[in-house]
């Protein structure tokens, strides 16, 4: 580690946030004399602070309004950072964001979009989570896409903007409001339009868990409140909201661990992440990725949603498909057919599942004990119980229990 490296690191440590023009001038005055030694900071063994260095210098120029120098520094730096590693997602996303803002200030919308389109690839990098024994449920209407997914062991995705709740993703109402308010600021408008175009390319699929899953390591370690472990397919609201009023079906998945992850060769990222539920979402100047795409109103908290987020650079497909692998029986644990599913649709589902006789297929019906509850009956395949697929025990009142005992004692049927 050279003396110059140490000096640069000390300067960066003292200037992690550039608040104003005065600080920007001071930072550049300190760092520019070391320009011959900037590449020394690319040394991974020494600590690899090169990304922080490039971000700081480019931000300094941006704060001063010197957008051309900011672009030059950021472009030269990001080429080296990409060359050094396929990772460092936070640094790369931050530098591409600077490029997007500065190109917008220079009036170059095409280059602004090109830079900002790199951000959606890096933002979900560190969000991947996996629960090897957890069941995830997908409620579907019967359609070409849903039957194709069931047949091919795939998951088709769609834009979050097409979900049933118009504020399901905070990003779209947030950016539309920003565009309305910044309509007279040409540079800001270019930047926001580029953001909307780039981040509008995210695709997603919603799954439902049997319990609220931890959002981070701290939550995973903390003691959690007890809850009734009732599988989602017993929830009449889920069928009504997401399965065409009980006319569709529900698939119980065990998502393989290698599905979620990053493919650096094709620049594709698939992330699995629980939704965070909040009381409100005030408008503010900036949104984090989690706030924009992985946060919903507490009114939806009963769903225990886990969202699959997909992005691939250069892929503009409306409904891309993610494969769950070749082991069908490992990926799909069970299929549940809605109580109002048309007979011809049920026949199509059963025809697909004949190729996988070990997987149970159930038909849902109104419970014999409670009109407001659902039951399942096995109509194909073999029963393969998991912790999450055991039907909840029906609680009966004291009088009913006594009456049953009396009926049994006198031999009535």
Regions found by a protein language model. Give the residues of each.
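Specific register positions within alpha-helical solenoid repeats of the TPR/Sel1-like families, i.e.
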Residues: 12-19, 62, 104
């Amino acid at each position: 580690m050279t003396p110059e490296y140490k000096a640069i690191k000390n300067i960066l440590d003292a200037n992690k946030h550039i608040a104003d023009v005065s600080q920007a001038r001071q930072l550049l005055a300190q760092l520019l004399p070391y320009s011959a030694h900037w590449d020394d900071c690319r040394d991974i063994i020494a600590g690899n602070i090169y990304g922080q260095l490039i971000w700081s210098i480019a931000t300094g120029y941006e704060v001063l309004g010197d957008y051309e120098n900011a672009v030059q520094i950021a472009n030269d730096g990001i080429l080296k950072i990409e060359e050094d590693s396929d990772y460092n997602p936070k640094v790369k996303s931050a530098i591409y964001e600077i490029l997007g803002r500065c190109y917008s200030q220079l009036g170059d919308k095409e280059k602004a979009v090109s830079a900002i389109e790199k951000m959606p690839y890096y933002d979900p990098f560190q969000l991947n989570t996996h629960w090897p024994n957890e069941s995830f449920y997908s409620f579907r209407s019967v359609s070409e896409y849903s039957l194709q997914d069931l047949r091919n062991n795939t998951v088709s995705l769609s834009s979050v903007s097409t979900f049933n709740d118009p504020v399901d993703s905070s990003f779209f109402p947030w950016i539309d409001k920003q565009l309305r308010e910044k309509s007279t600021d040409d540079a800001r408008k270019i930047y926001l339009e580029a953001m909307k175009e780039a981040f509008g390319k995210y695709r997603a699929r919603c799954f439902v868990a049997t319990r609220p899953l931890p959002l981070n390591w701290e939550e995973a370690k903390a003691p959690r409140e007890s809850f009734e472990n009732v599988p989602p397919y017993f929830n009449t609201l889920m069928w009504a909201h997401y399965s065409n009023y009980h006319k569709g079906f529900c698939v119980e998945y065990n998502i393989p661990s290698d599905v979620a992850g990053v493919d650096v060769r094709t620049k594709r990222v698939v992330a699995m992440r629980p939704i965070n539920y909040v009381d409100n979402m005030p408008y503010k100047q900036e949104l984090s990725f989690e706030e924009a795409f992985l946060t919903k109103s507490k009114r939806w908290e009963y769903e225990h949603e886990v969202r699959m987020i997909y992005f691939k650079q250069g892929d503009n497909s409306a409904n891309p498909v993610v494969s769950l692998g070749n082991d069908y029986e490992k990926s799909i644990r069970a299929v549940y057919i809605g109580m109002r599913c048309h007979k011809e649709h049920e026949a199509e589902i059963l025809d697909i599942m004949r190729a996988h006789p070990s997987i149970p297929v159930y038909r849902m019906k109104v419970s014999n004990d409670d009109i407001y509850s659902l039951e399942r009956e096995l109509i194909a395949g073999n029963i393969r119980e998991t912790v999450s697929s055991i039907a909840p025990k029906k609680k009966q009142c004291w009088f009913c229990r006594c009456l049953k005992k009396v009926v049994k004692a006198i031999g009535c049927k």
